[in-house]
Amino acid sequence: MTSVAVYWAPGCHLCEPVKATARAVCAELGVELREIDITGDDGLEAQYRASLPLVEIDGRRAFKYHLDEGEFRRRLARAGA
């Protein structure tokens, strides 16, 4: 089953629109979505802070900063969603 992870943090002005698009598309396609707040996790903050929001599809980085809905749908289709 295809899965999507969105890494985000409070105060990230780019994160909310990315999360909203990911939620809508994943709900429509029945794709598992995890929204991961990196706040307070030193390892995640070190790894992702400069790249927020970051979207992974099946554990692979797919989008950074912005989420193009059309390209997101195409990549999910290629992943089997």
Which sequence ranges carry the predicted segments?
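Non-catalytic, surface beta->alpha helical segment in thiol-disulfide oxidoreductase systems
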Residues: 59-81
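Short, low-complexity, intrinsically disordered N-terminal peptides in bacterial proteins
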Residues: 1-3, 24, 28, 73-81
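Structural micro-motif
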Residues: 49-55
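Thiol-based oxidoreductase modules, predominantly thioredoxin-like and allied folds used
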Residues: 31-42
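Short, flexible active-site loop motifs that bind/organize anionic cofactors or intermediates
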Residues: 5, 34, 62
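Local sequence-structure signature of Cys/Sec-based thiol-disulfide redox active-site neighborhoods
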Residues: 1-24
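Chalcogenol-based redox active-site neighborhoods
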Residues: 45
